[in-house]
Protein backbone atom coordinates (compact mmCIF):
# COMPACT_ATOMS: atom_id res chain seq x y z
CA UNK A 1 0.00 0.00 0.00
CA UNK A 2 2.77 2.40 0.98
CA UNK A 3 4.66 1.51 -2.20
CA UNK A 4 1.56 2.32 -4.23
CA UNK A 5 1.22 5.67 -2.50
CA UNK A 6 4.87 6.46 -3.20
CA UNK A 7 4.38 5.66 -6.88
CA UNK A 8 1.29 7.88 -7.06
CA UNK A 9 3.09 10.76 -5.32
CA UNK A 10 6.14 10.33 -7.56
CA UNK A 11 3.91 10.33 -10.62
CA UNK A 12 2.19 13.52 -9.45
CA UNK A 13 5.56 15.16 -8.82
CA UNK A 14 6.78 14.17 -12.28
CA UNK A 15 3.59 15.48 -13.89
CA UNK A 16 3.91 18.70 -11.92
CA UNK A 17 7.55 19.09 -12.94
CA UNK A 18 6.63 18.39 -16.56
CA UNK A 19 3.85 20.99 -16.42
CA UNK A 20 6.16 23.54 -14.82
CA UNK A 21 8.84 22.82 -17.43
CA UNK A 22 6.33 23.06 -20.27
CA UNK A 23 4.99 26.35 -18.91
CA UNK A 24 8.50 27.74 -18.52
CA UNK A 25 9.39 26.68 -22.07
CA UNK A 26 6.18 28.20 -23.43
CA UNK A 27 6.84 31.42 -21.52
CA UNK A 28 10.42 31.53 -22.80
CA UNK A 29 9.36 30.95 -26.40
CA UNK A 30 6.62 33.56 -26.09
CA UNK A 31 9.12 36.08 -24.77
CA UNK A 32 11.75 35.29 -27.43
CA UNK A 33 9.42 34.88 -30.40
CA UNK A 34 6.85 37.57 -29.60
CA UNK A 35 7.62 39.93 -26.72
CA UNK A 36 11.26 40.75 -27.56
CA UNK A 37 10.61 41.50 -31.26
CA UNK A 38 7.54 43.59 -30.31
CA UNK A 39 9.71 45.74 -28.05
CA UNK A 40 12.13 46.37 -30.90
CA UNK A 41 9.27 47.21 -33.27
CA UNK A 42 7.80 49.56 -30.66
CA UNK A 43 11.14 51.41 -30.51
CA UNK A 44 10.97 51.98 -34.26
CA UNK A 45 7.31 53.05 -34.07
CA UNK A 46 8.30 55.74 -31.56
CA UNK A 47 10.68 57.07 -34.22
CA UNK A 48 7.88 57.20 -36.78
CA UNK A 49 9.08 54.10 -38.66
CA UNK A 50 6.21 51.84 -39.68
CA UNK A 51 5.88 48.42 -41.20
CA UNK A 52 3.47 45.52 -41.72
CA UNK A 53 1.89 43.99 -38.62
CA UNK A 54 3.54 40.66 -37.74
CA UNK A 55 1.66 37.47 -36.89
CA UNK A 56 2.62 34.92 -34.25
CA UNK A 57 4.89 32.98 -34.57
CA UNK A 58 6.23 33.59 -38.10
CA UNK A 59 6.10 37.37 -38.31
CA UNK A 60 5.42 38.52 -41.88
CA UNK A 61 6.51 35.31 -43.57
CA UNK A 62 2.98 34.37 -44.67
CA UNK A 63 2.53 37.78 -46.34
CA UNK A 64 5.83 37.35 -48.17
CA UNK A 65 4.96 33.89 -49.45
CA UNK A 66 1.53 35.01 -50.57
CA UNK A 67 3.00 37.96 -52.50
CA UNK A 68 5.59 35.75 -54.19
CA UNK A 69 2.96 33.16 -55.17
CA UNK A 70 0.76 35.87 -56.70
CA UNK A 71 3.70 37.38 -58.59
CA UNK A 72 4.74 33.98 -59.93
CA UNK A 73 1.19 33.29 -61.09
CA UNK A 74 1.08 36.61 -62.93
CA UNK A 75 4.44 35.89 -64.57
CA UNK A 76 3.34 32.42 -65.66
CA UNK A 77 0.15 33.85 -67.17
CA UNK A 78 2.09 36.57 -68.99
CA UNK A 79 4.53 33.96 -70.31
CA UNK A 80 1.66 31.76 -71.49
CA UNK A 81 -0.02 34.66 -73.32
CA UNK A 82 3.25 35.66 -74.92
CA UNK A 83 3.86 32.15 -76.23
CA UNK A 84 0.29 31.86 -77.50
CA UNK A 85 0.59 35.18 -79.28
CA UNK A 86 3.88 34.08 -80.93
CA UNK A 87 4.33 37.36 -82.76
CA UNK A 88 7.48 36.12 -84.49
CA UNK A 89 9.70 38.87 -83.16
CA UNK A 90 11.66 36.54 -80.90
CA UNK A 91 15.10 37.79 -80.16
CA UNK A 92 14.07 41.43 -80.41
CA UNK A 93 13.74 41.74 -76.65
CA UNK A 94 10.21 43.09 -76.92
CA UNK A 95 8.58 43.29 -73.52
CA UNK A 96 11.78 43.02 -71.47
CA UNK A 97 11.72 45.38 -68.50
CA UNK A 98 14.94 45.90 -66.54
CA UNK A 99 13.29 45.87 -63.13
CA UNK A 100 13.04 42.49 -61.45
CA UNK A 101 11.67 43.78 -58.13
CA UNK A 102 7.90 43.29 -58.75
CA UNK A 103 8.52 39.67 -59.76
CA UNK A 104 11.29 38.67 -57.34
CA UNK A 105 10.65 40.89 -54.30
CA UNK A 106 6.99 41.95 -54.58
CA UNK A 107 6.44 42.26 -50.82
CA UNK A 108 9.23 44.82 -50.47
CA UNK A 109 7.74 46.88 -53.28
CA UNK A 110 4.34 46.91 -51.61
CA UNK A 111 5.71 47.77 -48.17
CA UNK A 112 7.93 50.51 -49.56
CA UNK A 113 4.88 52.13 -51.17
CA UNK A 114 2.86 51.72 -47.98
CA UNK A 115 5.46 52.76 -45.39
CA UNK A 116 8.15 54.73 -47.21
CA UNK A 117 11.90 54.21 -47.74
CA UNK A 118 12.50 52.94 -44.18
CA UNK A 119 10.28 50.25 -42.71
CA UNK A 120 10.41 47.19 -40.48
CA UNK A 121 9.24 43.62 -40.92
CA UNK A 122 9.98 40.36 -39.16
CA UNK A 123 10.56 36.70 -39.91
CA UNK A 124 9.94 34.64 -36.83
CA UNK A 125 11.68 36.49 -34.02
CA UNK A 126 14.15 38.26 -36.32
CA UNK A 127 13.47 41.97 -36.89
CA UNK A 128 14.61 43.61 -40.12
CA UNK A 129 15.04 47.27 -40.96
CA UNK A 130 14.67 47.83 -44.70
CA UNK A 131 16.52 51.03 -45.68
CA UNK A 132 16.51 52.81 -49.05
CA UNK A 133 16.73 56.44 -47.88
CA UNK A 134 19.95 57.76 -49.44
CA UNK A 135 21.27 59.70 -46.43
CA UNK A 136 20.86 56.71 -44.10
CA UNK A 137 22.37 54.35 -46.68
CA UNK A 138 25.35 56.69 -47.02
CA UNK A 139 25.93 56.76 -43.24
CA UNK A 140 25.72 52.97 -43.03
CA UNK A 141 28.23 52.59 -45.85
CA UNK A 142 30.62 55.07 -44.24
CA UNK A 143 30.58 53.23 -40.90
CA UNK A 144 33.88 51.50 -40.10
CA UNK A 145 32.99 50.35 -36.58
CA UNK A 146 33.19 46.63 -35.87
CA UNK A 147 29.85 47.10 -34.07
CA UNK A 148 28.26 46.97 -37.52
CA UNK A 149 28.75 43.49 -38.91
CA UNK A 150 27.33 40.87 -41.21
CA UNK A 151 23.83 39.65 -40.55
CA UNK A 152 23.69 36.49 -38.46
CA UNK A 153 20.22 35.64 -39.81
CA UNK A 154 20.26 32.10 -41.16
CA UNK A 155 24.02 31.99 -40.60
CA UNK A 156 23.68 28.52 -39.15
CA UNK A 157 21.69 27.34 -42.17
CA UNK A 158 24.42 28.64 -44.48
CA UNK A 159 27.19 27.30 -42.23
CA UNK A 160 28.09 24.40 -44.58
CA UNK A 161 28.61 26.87 -47.43
CA UNK A 162 30.33 29.83 -45.75
CA UNK A 163 31.49 28.55 -42.37
CA UNK A 164 33.52 31.18 -40.54
CA UNK A 165 35.00 32.64 -43.73
CA UNK A 166 35.32 36.31 -44.56
CA UNK A 167 31.84 36.62 -46.08
CA UNK A 168 30.06 35.84 -42.81
CA UNK A 169 32.52 36.58 -39.99
CA UNK A 170 32.44 39.67 -37.77
CA UNK A 171 34.65 41.68 -35.44
CA UNK A 172 38.33 40.93 -35.04
CA UNK A 173 37.99 37.58 -36.85
CA UNK A 174 36.72 39.39 -39.95
CA UNK A 175 39.37 42.13 -39.72
CA UNK A 176 42.13 39.50 -39.48
CA UNK A 177 40.86 37.55 -42.48
CA UNK A 178 40.39 40.67 -44.59
CA UNK A 179 43.96 41.76 -43.93
CA UNK A 180 45.26 38.39 -45.10
CA UNK A 181 43.13 38.03 -48.23
CA UNK A 182 43.32 41.68 -49.34
CA UNK A 183 47.03 41.29 -50.18
CA UNK A 184 46.20 38.68 -52.82
CA UNK A 185 43.87 41.02 -54.72
CA UNK A 186 46.07 44.12 -54.98
CA UNK A 187 45.99 45.65 -58.47
CA UNK A 188 49.51 44.54 -59.38
CA UNK A 189 48.65 40.91 -58.63
CA UNK A 190 45.38 41.13 -60.60
CA UNK A 191 47.30 42.47 -63.62
CA UNK A 192 49.46 39.37 -63.51
CA UNK A 193 46.39 37.14 -63.75
CA UNK A 194 45.07 38.46 -67.10
CA UNK A 195 47.11 35.98 -69.18
CA UNK A 196 45.64 33.19 -67.09
CA UNK A 197 42.13 34.54 -67.79
CA UNK A 198 42.82 34.68 -71.54
CA UNK A 199 44.03 31.06 -71.50
CA UNK A 200 40.93 29.96 -69.61
CA UNK A 201 38.66 31.49 -72.28
CA UNK A 202 40.14 29.49 -75.15
CA UNK A 203 38.04 26.36 -74.58
CA UNK A 204 34.82 28.40 -74.71
CA UNK A 205 35.87 30.35 -77.82
CA UNK A 206 36.95 27.22 -79.68
CA UNK A 207 33.74 25.37 -78.76
CA UNK A 208 31.56 28.20 -80.07
CA UNK A 209 33.61 28.55 -83.27
CA UNK A 210 33.32 24.82 -83.97
CA UNK A 211 29.58 24.93 -83.30
CA UNK A 212 29.13 27.76 -85.79
CA UNK A 213 31.15 25.92 -88.45
CA UNK A 214 29.12 22.73 -88.00
CA UNK A 215 25.78 24.53 -88.17
CA UNK A 216 26.12 26.56 -91.34
CA UNK A 217 27.43 29.77 -89.85
CA UNK A 218 25.00 30.29 -86.94
CA UNK A 219 24.35 28.57 -83.63
CA UNK A 220 21.63 29.03 -81.07
CA UNK A 221 22.96 28.18 -77.61
CA UNK A 222 22.31 28.54 -73.92
CA UNK A 223 25.52 30.17 -72.76
CA UNK A 224 25.32 29.72 -68.97
CA UNK A 225 27.19 26.43 -68.57
CA UNK A 226 30.01 27.58 -70.84
CA UNK A 227 30.35 30.85 -68.93
CA UNK A 228 30.38 28.98 -65.61
CA UNK A 229 33.02 26.60 -66.94
CA UNK A 230 35.21 29.57 -67.88
CA UNK A 231 34.75 31.24 -64.50
CA UNK A 232 35.42 27.97 -62.68
CA UNK A 233 38.62 27.50 -64.68
CA UNK A 234 39.83 31.01 -63.82
CA UNK A 235 39.16 30.77 -60.10
CA UNK A 236 40.49 27.18 -59.98
CA UNK A 237 43.78 28.19 -61.57
CA UNK A 238 44.00 31.21 -59.26
CA UNK A 239 43.26 29.24 -56.10
CA UNK A 240 44.84 25.88 -56.85
CA UNK A 241 47.51 26.50 -59.48
CA UNK A 242 48.54 23.27 -61.20
CA UNK A 243 45.86 21.36 -59.25
CA UNK A 244 43.11 23.38 -60.94
CA UNK A 245 41.43 20.33 -62.48
CA UNK A 246 40.78 18.95 -59.00
CA UNK A 247 39.78 22.46 -58.02
CA UNK A 248 37.01 22.50 -60.63
CA UNK A 249 35.65 19.29 -59.12
CA UNK A 250 35.58 21.03 -55.74
CA UNK A 251 33.65 23.94 -57.20
CA UNK A 252 31.07 21.61 -58.73
CA UNK A 253 30.44 20.20 -55.27
CA UNK A 254 30.30 23.70 -53.75
CA UNK A 255 27.65 24.61 -56.35
CA UNK A 256 25.62 21.57 -55.25
CA UNK A 257 26.09 22.74 -51.67
CA UNK A 258 24.88 26.21 -52.64
CA UNK A 259 21.68 24.72 -54.06
CA UNK A 260 21.17 22.69 -50.89
CA UNK A 261 21.30 25.72 -48.58
CA UNK A 262 19.84 28.44 -50.86
CA UNK A 263 16.26 28.16 -49.58
CA UNK A 264 15.89 29.90 -46.20
CA UNK A 265 13.83 27.91 -43.71
CA UNK A 266 12.51 30.01 -40.86
CA UNK A 267 10.85 26.99 -39.24
CA UNK A 268 14.21 25.22 -39.10
CA UNK A 269 15.84 28.25 -37.50
CA UNK A 270 13.13 28.68 -34.87
CA UNK A 271 12.72 25.03 -33.92
CA UNK A 272 16.27 23.76 -34.24
CA UNK A 273 15.24 21.51 -37.15
CA UNK A 274 18.53 22.39 -38.84
CA UNK A 275 20.28 20.09 -36.32
CA UNK A 276 18.18 17.04 -37.27
CA UNK A 277 19.32 14.51 -39.89
CA UNK A 278 16.58 15.29 -42.41
CA UNK A 279 17.30 14.79 -46.12
CA UNK A 280 18.30 18.38 -46.87
CA UNK A 281 20.61 18.61 -43.85
CA UNK A 282 22.27 15.26 -44.53
CA UNK A 283 22.95 16.28 -48.13
CA UNK A 284 24.53 19.57 -47.02
CA UNK A 285 26.60 17.89 -44.31
CA UNK A 286 27.92 15.22 -46.69
CA UNK A 287 28.87 17.78 -49.36
CA UNK A 288 30.57 19.90 -46.71
CA UNK A 289 32.69 16.92 -45.60
CA UNK A 290 33.65 16.08 -49.19
CA UNK A 291 34.67 19.66 -49.99
CA UNK A 292 36.65 19.96 -46.74
CA UNK A 293 38.54 16.76 -47.50
CA UNK A 294 39.29 17.66 -51.14
CA UNK A 295 40.60 21.14 -50.32
CA UNK A 296 42.95 19.82 -47.64
CA UNK A 297 44.22 17.15 -50.05
CA UNK A 298 45.16 19.86 -52.55
CA UNK A 299 46.87 21.85 -49.79
CA UNK A 300 49.08 18.84 -49.03
CA UNK A 301 49.84 18.24 -52.73
CA UNK A 302 50.62 21.85 -53.62
CA UNK A 303 53.96 21.96 -51.82
CA UNK A 304 55.70 25.30 -52.32
CA UNK A 305 53.71 26.33 -55.42
CA UNK A 306 52.49 29.93 -55.21
CA UNK A 307 48.74 30.28 -55.52
CA UNK A 308 45.93 31.88 -53.56
CA UNK A 309 45.33 28.77 -51.48
CA UNK A 310 49.02 28.65 -50.56
CA UNK A 311 48.96 32.31 -49.52
CA UNK A 312 45.98 31.69 -47.24
CA UNK A 313 47.73 28.62 -45.80
CA UNK A 314 50.91 30.57 -45.01
CA UNK A 315 48.91 33.35 -43.38
CA UNK A 316 46.98 30.88 -41.26
CA UNK A 317 50.21 29.14 -40.23
CA UNK A 318 51.87 32.41 -39.23
CA UNK A 319 48.91 33.26 -37.00
CA UNK A 320 49.87 30.41 -34.64
CA UNK A 321 46.37 28.97 -34.44
CA UNK A 322 45.45 25.38 -33.69
CA UNK A 323 45.60 22.92 -36.61
CA UNK A 324 41.82 22.37 -36.75
CA UNK A 325 41.21 26.12 -36.66
CA UNK A 326 43.77 26.71 -39.42
CA UNK A 327 42.16 24.02 -41.58
CA UNK A 328 38.73 25.58 -41.12
CA UNK A 329 40.18 28.99 -41.96
CA UNK A 330 41.57 27.65 -45.25
CA UNK A 331 38.46 25.70 -46.24
CA UNK A 332 35.93 28.39 -45.28
CA UNK A 333 37.75 31.11 -47.17
CA UNK A 334 38.24 28.89 -50.18
CA UNK A 335 34.45 28.44 -50.29
CA UNK A 336 33.90 32.17 -49.77
CA UNK A 337 36.24 33.01 -52.65
CA UNK A 338 34.44 30.48 -54.82
CA UNK A 339 31.06 32.04 -54.15
CA UNK A 340 32.23 35.62 -54.62
CA UNK A 341 34.66 34.98 -57.47
CA UNK A 342 32.95 32.27 -59.48
CA UNK A 343 29.19 32.27 -59.21
CA UNK A 344 28.64 36.04 -59.10
CA UNK A 345 31.06 36.73 -61.95
CA UNK A 346 29.59 34.03 -64.19
CA UNK A 347 26.05 35.31 -63.70
CA UNK A 348 27.11 38.92 -64.36
CA UNK A 349 28.83 37.84 -67.59
CA UNK A 350 25.62 36.10 -68.72
CA UNK A 351 23.53 39.22 -68.00
CA UNK A 352 26.08 41.39 -69.82
CA UNK A 353 26.03 39.24 -72.96
CA UNK A 354 22.22 39.23 -72.88
CA UNK A 355 22.20 43.04 -72.81
CA UNK A 356 24.74 43.28 -75.63
CA UNK A 357 22.62 40.89 -77.68
CA UNK A 358 19.65 43.14 -76.98
CA UNK A 359 21.52 46.34 -77.89
CA UNK A 360 23.55 45.86 -81.10
CA UNK A 361 24.58 49.52 -81.18
CA UNK A 362 26.55 49.06 -77.95
CA UNK A 363 27.85 45.72 -79.14
CA UNK A 364 29.29 47.49 -82.20
CA UNK A 365 30.84 50.23 -80.05
CA UNK A 366 32.53 47.71 -77.78
CA UNK A 367 33.76 45.62 -80.71
CA UNK A 368 35.27 48.64 -82.47
CA UNK A 369 36.95 49.67 -79.23
CA UNK A 370 38.46 46.22 -78.65
CA UNK A 371 39.75 46.07 -82.22
CA UNK A 372 41.25 49.55 -81.96
CA UNK A 373 42.87 49.02 -78.56
CA UNK A 374 44.26 45.55 -79.23
CA UNK A 375 45.24 46.20 -82.88
CA UNK A 376 45.50 42.48 -83.57
CA UNK A 377 47.49 41.73 -80.41
CA UNK A 378 46.31 39.49 -77.55
CA UNK A 379 44.31 41.05 -74.73
CA UNK A 380 46.50 42.06 -71.77
CA UNK A 381 46.17 44.12 -68.60
CA UNK A 382 47.17 47.37 -70.33
CA UNK A 383 44.64 46.99 -73.14
CA UNK A 384 41.88 46.18 -70.63
CA UNK A 385 42.50 49.50 -68.87
CA UNK A 386 41.89 51.36 -72.15
CA UNK A 387 38.50 49.76 -72.86
CA UNK A 388 36.25 52.55 -71.57
CA UNK A 389 33.09 51.56 -73.46
CA UNK A 390 33.36 47.98 -72.24
CA UNK A 391 33.85 49.20 -68.68
CA UNK A 392 30.71 51.33 -68.94
CA UNK A 393 28.70 48.40 -70.33
CA UNK A 394 29.75 46.18 -67.41
CA UNK A 395 29.00 48.93 -64.90
CA UNK A 396 25.52 49.39 -66.38
CA UNK A 397 24.97 45.62 -66.32
CA UNK A 398 25.83 45.61 -62.61
CA UNK A 399 23.43 48.49 -62.05
CA UNK A 400 20.47 46.74 -63.69
CA UNK A 401 21.32 43.19 -62.59
CA UNK A 402 23.48 43.30 -59.44
CA UNK A 403 24.36 39.79 -58.31
CA UNK A 404 23.57 40.59 -54.69
CA UNK A 405 20.01 41.70 -54.03
CA UNK A 406 20.94 43.28 -50.69
CA UNK A 407 23.70 44.78 -48.66
CA UNK A 408 23.00 43.10 -45.33
CA UNK A 409 24.33 44.23 -41.99
CA UNK A 410 23.52 43.68 -38.32
CA UNK A 411 23.76 46.09 -35.41
CA UNK A 412 26.02 44.17 -33.03
CA UNK A 413 25.57 47.06 -30.58
CA UNK A 414 23.13 49.98 -30.50
CA UNK A 415 23.85 52.28 -33.44
CA UNK A 416 22.52 55.47 -35.02
CA UNK A 417 22.50 56.38 -38.71
CA UNK A 418 20.91 59.45 -40.27
CA UNK A 419 19.04 60.17 -37.06
CA UNK A 420 17.61 56.62 -36.90
CA UNK A 421 18.34 54.76 -33.65
CA UNK A 422 18.86 51.04 -34.31
CA UNK A 423 18.66 48.63 -31.33
CA UNK A 424 21.23 45.88 -30.88
CA UNK A 425 20.51 42.74 -32.89
CA UNK A 426 18.44 44.35 -35.64
CA UNK A 427 19.22 43.19 -39.18
CA UNK A 428 19.64 46.02 -41.69
CA UNK A 429 18.82 45.33 -45.34
CA UNK A 430 19.71 47.83 -48.08
CA UNK A 431 17.95 46.82 -51.33
CA UNK A 432 20.61 47.23 -54.01
CA UNK A 433 18.15 47.18 -56.92
CA UNK A 434 16.03 49.92 -55.31
CA UNK A 435 19.08 52.18 -54.96
CA UNK A 436 20.13 51.37 -58.53
CA UNK A 437 16.66 52.17 -59.91
CA UNK A 438 15.97 55.38 -58.00
CA UNK A 439 15.12 58.08 -60.60
CA UNK A 440 16.18 60.78 -58.14
CA UNK A 441 19.69 59.33 -58.17
CA UNK A 442 19.95 58.13 -61.77
CA UNK A 443 17.49 60.15 -63.85
CA UNK A 444 14.19 59.41 -65.62
CA UNK A 445 15.68 56.70 -67.88
CA UNK A 446 16.59 54.63 -64.84
CA UNK A 447 15.05 51.39 -66.19
CA UNK A 448 16.78 51.67 -69.56
CA UNK A 449 20.14 50.24 -70.58
CA UNK A 450 22.30 53.35 -70.99
CA UNK A 451 26.02 52.80 -70.28
CA UNK A 452 26.65 56.43 -71.22
CA UNK A 453 25.53 57.42 -67.73
CA UNK A 454 28.93 56.20 -66.46
CA UNK A 455 30.96 58.21 -68.99
CA UNK A 456 31.67 61.33 -66.95
CA UNK A 457 31.65 60.63 -63.23
CA UNK A 458 31.66 57.81 -60.73
CA UNK A 459 28.35 57.34 -58.88
CA UNK A 460 27.97 58.35 -55.26
CA UNK A 461 28.70 55.90 -52.46
CA UNK A 462 25.04 55.41 -51.54
CA UNK A 463 23.70 55.03 -55.09
CA UNK A 464 25.83 52.25 -56.62
CA UNK A 465 26.39 49.08 -54.63
CA UNK A 466 27.16 46.06 -56.87
CA UNK A 467 30.22 45.23 -54.76
CA UNK A 468 28.81 46.50 -51.48
CA UNK A 469 30.32 49.62 -49.97
CA UNK A 470 32.34 50.93 -47.08
CA UNK A 471 34.57 48.79 -44.90
CA UNK A 472 33.16 45.55 -46.28
CA UNK A 473 33.43 46.39 -49.98
CA UNK A 474 34.17 43.24 -51.99
CA UNK A 475 37.92 42.61 -51.98
CA UNK A 476 37.80 40.88 -55.35
CA UNK A 477 36.05 43.59 -57.37
CA UNK A 478 39.24 44.40 -59.32
CA UNK A 479 39.70 40.69 -60.06
CA UNK A 480 36.03 40.34 -61.09
CA UNK A 481 36.18 43.36 -63.41
CA UNK A 482 39.37 42.05 -65.06
CA UNK A 483 37.79 38.63 -65.54
CA UNK A 484 34.60 40.12 -67.01
CA UNK A 485 36.45 42.50 -69.33
CA UNK A 486 38.74 39.72 -70.54
CA UNK A 487 35.90 37.35 -71.38
CA UNK A 488 33.53 39.91 -72.92
CA UNK A 489 36.27 41.50 -75.04
CA UNK A 490 37.33 38.11 -76.42
CA UNK A 491 33.75 37.06 -77.19
CA UNK A 492 32.78 40.37 -78.80
CA UNK A 493 35.90 40.40 -80.97
CA UNK A 494 34.96 37.02 -82.45
CA UNK A 495 31.16 36.76 -82.41
CA UNK A 496 28.09 38.79 -83.29
CA UNK A 497 25.45 38.25 -80.60
CA UNK A 498 21.70 38.33 -81.01
CA UNK A 499 19.09 37.48 -78.42
CA UNK A 500 17.60 34.10 -79.32
CA UNK A 501 13.84 33.58 -79.83
CA UNK A 502 14.18 30.91 -77.13
CA UNK A 503 15.21 33.43 -74.46
CA UNK A 504 12.75 33.81 -71.56
CA UNK A 505 13.45 36.86 -69.43
CA UNK A 506 12.85 35.72 -65.87
CA UNK A 507 15.30 36.91 -63.19
CA UNK A 508 15.09 34.85 -60.02
CA UNK A 509 16.66 35.16 -56.58
CA UNK A 510 18.50 32.17 -55.19
CA UNK A 511 21.54 33.26 -53.23
CA UNK A 512 22.12 35.74 -56.06
CA UNK A 513 19.93 37.17 -58.84
CA UNK A 514 20.31 34.99 -61.93
CA UNK A 515 18.39 34.11 -65.12
CA UNK A 516 15.86 31.44 -64.14
CA UNK A 517 15.90 29.78 -67.58
CA UNK A 518 19.42 30.77 -68.61
CA UNK A 519 20.48 33.09 -71.43
CA UNK A 520 19.89 31.97 -75.03
CA UNK A 521 21.87 33.70 -77.78
CA UNK A 522 22.25 33.31 -81.53
CA UNK A 523 25.92 33.55 -82.56
CA UNK A 524 27.64 34.22 -85.87
CA UNK A 525 31.29 34.95 -86.57
CA UNK A 526 32.60 38.47 -86.83
CA UNK A 527 33.71 38.87 -90.43
CA UNK A 528 37.47 38.57 -90.62
CA UNK A 529 37.83 37.26 -87.06
CA UNK A 530 40.79 34.96 -86.47
CA UNK A 531 39.97 31.24 -86.65
CA UNK A 532 41.64 28.71 -84.35
Curated annotation (Swiss-Prot):
Residues 1-2 are lumenal. Highly expressed in shoot, spikelet and uppermost internode. Detected in roots, leaves and anthers. Catalyzes the 13-hydroxylation of gibberellins (GAs). Determines the ratio of GA4 and GA1. Converts GA12 into GA53. InterPro entries: Cyt_P450, Cyt_P450_CS, Cyt_P450_E_grp-I, Cyt_P450_sf, Cytochrome_P450_Monooxygen. Its EC number is 1.14.-.-. Residues 24-532 are cytoplasmic. The chain crosses the membrane at residues 3-23. One of its GO terms (cellular component) is membrane. This is Cytochrome P450 714B2. It is a single-pass type III membrane protein. SUPFAM superfamilies: Cytochrome P450 (SSF48264). One of its GO terms (biological process) is lipid metabolic process. The keyword Metal-binding applies. It comes from Oryza sativa subsp. japonica (Rice). Its cofactor is heme. Overexpression of CYP714B2 in a heterologous system causes semi-dwarfism and increased 13-OH GAs content. Induction: Up-regulated by bioactive gibberellins. Heme binds at residue 474. Belongs to the cytochrome P450 family. One of its GO terms (molecular function) is heme binding. Keywords: Heme, Iron, Membrane, Metal-binding, Monooxygenase, Oxidoreductase, Signal-anchor, Transmembrane, Transmembrane helix. It is found in: Membrane. CDD domains: CYP714. Disruption phenotype: No visible phenotype and no change in the levels of 13-OH GAs; due to the redundancy with CYP714B1. Cyp714b1 and cyp714b2 double mutants have decreased levels of 13-OH GAs, increased levels of 13-H GAs, including GA4, and longer uppermost internode.
Amino acid sequence: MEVGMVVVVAAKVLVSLWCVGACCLAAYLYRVVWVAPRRVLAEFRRQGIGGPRPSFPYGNLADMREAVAAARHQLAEARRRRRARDSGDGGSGAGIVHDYRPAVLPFYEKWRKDYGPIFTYSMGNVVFLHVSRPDVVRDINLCVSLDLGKSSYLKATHEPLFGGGILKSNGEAWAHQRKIIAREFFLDKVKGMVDLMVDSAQTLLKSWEEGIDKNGGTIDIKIDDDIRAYSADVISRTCFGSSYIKGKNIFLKIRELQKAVSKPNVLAEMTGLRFFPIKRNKQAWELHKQVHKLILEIVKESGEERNLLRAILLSASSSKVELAEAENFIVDNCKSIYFAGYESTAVTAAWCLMLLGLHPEWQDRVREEVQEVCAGQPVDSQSLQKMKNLTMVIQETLRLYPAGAFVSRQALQELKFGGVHIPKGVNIYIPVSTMHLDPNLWGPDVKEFNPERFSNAQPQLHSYLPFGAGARTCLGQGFAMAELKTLISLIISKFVLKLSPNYEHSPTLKLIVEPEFGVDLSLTRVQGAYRH
